[in-house]
Each structure stands twice: as structure tokens, then as C-alpha cells.
Amino acid sequence: MSKQPATNKKPVKAKKKAFQNVPSGIAHVKATFNNTIIAITDPSGRVISWASAGKVNFSGSRKSSAFAATVAAQDAAKTASSLGMKEVEVNLKGPGAGRESAVRGLQSAGLTITAIRDTTPVPHNGCRPRKRRRV
């Protein structure tokens, strides 16, 4: 049995689908105690742009600040508006400090906010919460 000659072919990457013009979408804001993550999707749920406090060069305890959430929201909104997005619905999730400031960041970047929805999951007495912090 002869061996096949070794070929130096790289694996083929799938090309990203170019979004032509997406006029409206949904901004999902997940604000945890340690970070804020913003994902802007089209109405069917495909992610168009995203940003987090860590992506815009905040690290450590500064990631959990309201200012970091504002900068991250502006970063995600600029990318989405360059693809033609004009208006968004906002879904807020989580108890973090960046909830309201992320909404302000989306507005200041030029997106029109049509609705604000709070989709924070509330337990029906599920897992035991973490212990109280004593400073």
C-alpha cells in the first residue's frame, strides 16, 4: 500500500454572512455583578454585533462599573448602526450595575429604543443564594 502524498492544505473557513441592511433588532443586555455583555441581534435572533466590558479594555473590578457598560453598549451600537440598524428593543437581564447605563449608551450611539423589557430570571425558591457579604 502506498501512502498518499502529504498535502499542506489549510482547513477551509466558512465565510461570514454579510448583513446588508437590518433596520431593527433586539439588544440583549446581561448585567452581572462582574461584567456586562451586550449582544445586538436581528429579530430572528442572529447576532449582528456584540461587546462586553472586557472587550473594550476594562479589567478586574472596573468591568463591573456602570461606565464600562456604557462604553460597551456604544461599541456594540456603532457596529450595528454601520450595518443599517436604526431602532432596537432592549432586553435587560441580571442584577448588575450596568443595566440602565447600557440603555443610555445605546441611545447615545444613535439607536432609537422602542421597548425596554426586563427578562431577569426569578427563581421560585430554587438554589440557595450565596452568603451575605460583610464589609
Swiss-Prot record:
GO terms for cellular component: ribonucleoprotein complex; ribosome. It holds the Pfam family Ribosomal_S11. Keywords: Ribonucleoprotein, Ribosomal protein, RNA-binding, rRNA-binding. It comes from the Bacteria. GO terms for molecular function: rRNA binding; structural constituent of ribosome. SUPFAM superfamilies: Translational machinery components (SSF53137). One of its GO terms (biological process) is translation. PROSITE patterns: RIBOSOMAL_S11. InterPro entries: Ribosomal_uS11, Ribosomal_uS11_bac-type, Ribosomal_uS11_CS, Ribosomal_uS11_sf. The keyword Transport does not apply. Part of the 30S ribosomal subunit. Interacts with proteins S7 and S18. Binds to IF-3. PANTHER family: 40S RIBOSOMAL PROTEIN S14/30S RIBOSOMAL PROTEIN S11. Located on the platform of the 30S subunit, it bridges several disparate RNA helices of the 16S rRNA. Forms part of the Shine-Dalgarno cleft in the 70S ribosome. Belongs to the universal ribosomal protein uS11 family. This is Small ribosomal subunit protein uS11. It comes from Protochlamydia amoebophila (strain UWE25).
